[in-house]
Regions:
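Domain-scale signature associated with acetyltransferase and cell-envelope carbohydrate enzymes
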Residues: 1-117, 140-141, 159, 175, ...
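A short, glycine- and basic residue-enriched loop/turn
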Residues: 136-137, 154-155, 176
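Glycine-rich NAD(P)-binding loop of Rossmann-like domains
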Residues: 77, 129-140
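Beta-rich strand-turn-strand
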Residues: 93-99, 147-162, 167-171
């Protein structure tokens, strides 16, 4: 890791500007955005649509060519919901698109390029029409979605499970497993008795974290 050679006052000024941008441009786009959010390069984070709720200790890492996008496009005005729990990580290029409901639990990690959707968006033969009814997506606590994984409509993913890189999840995933492939299938079971350290543990003292990294 390279040493930060910036003067301390310049670092503080940069962080203050970043917080200002989040508070004035991103927070108003959310129905709720919790405390201790860390949004890196917030100019490249796109939040749009109604009923977007984001919990505490949210982390988003965006890049100019790999934006982070959270959007609700309901079938009717004001419809559709996204609920993101506490201590969730969204990496560059990750996208969440809801027409009905997407619920993401605490401590979930989205790697680069992950896509989560609850709708097909368009019909196959008439591309001008919206698809059939969307189906909610529920992702439980401490799920890890690998690089460029895709989660499609109607899916539930159980607690602690891992979705491998580029997997396409088309059906429910039980808790404590690893799935891979297209369509995703179980390739390994995790030991539910083994201690698991989560992002919720990491952010158990968020104020202390801020002091540590200051």
């Amino acid at each position: 890791m390279r040493k930060d050679l910036r003067p301390y006052w310049l670092k503080r000024a940069y962080l203050a500007c970043r917080s200002w941008y989040v508070d004035y441009f991103l927070r108003p786009e959310c129905a709720s955005l919790g405390r201790f959010a860390t949004i890196m390069k917030p100019r490249f984070v796109i939040i749009s649509g109604p009923n977007i709720h984001i919990g505490d200790c949210f982390t988003a890492i965006a890049e100019p060519m790999h934006r982070v996008e959270i959007g609700v496009w309901g079938r009717e005005a004001g419809a559709g919901t996204i609920r993101i729990g506490n201590a969730v990580l969204m990496s560059p290029g990750s996208r969440i698109s809801a027409s009905d409901e997407i619920v993401i639990g605490d401590g979930v990690m989205l790697a680069n390029g992950v896509y989560i959707t609850d709708s097909d968006w368009h019909t196959v033969y008439d591309r001008t029409q919206r698809a059939e009814e969307p189906t909610p997506v529920h992702i439980a606590n401490n799920v890890w979605l690998g690089d460029h994984a895709t989660v499609l409509k109607g899916v539930s993913i159980g607690e602690n499970s891992v979705v491998a890189a580029r997997a396409v999840v088309t059906r429910d995933v039980p808790a404590n497993v690893i799935v891979a492939g297209n369509p995703a299938r179980v390739v390994r079971e995790l030991d539910p008795e083994r201690e698991m350290i989560t992002r919720m543990d990491y952010f158990s003292d968020p104020e202390g974290q801020l002091r540590f990294f200051d």
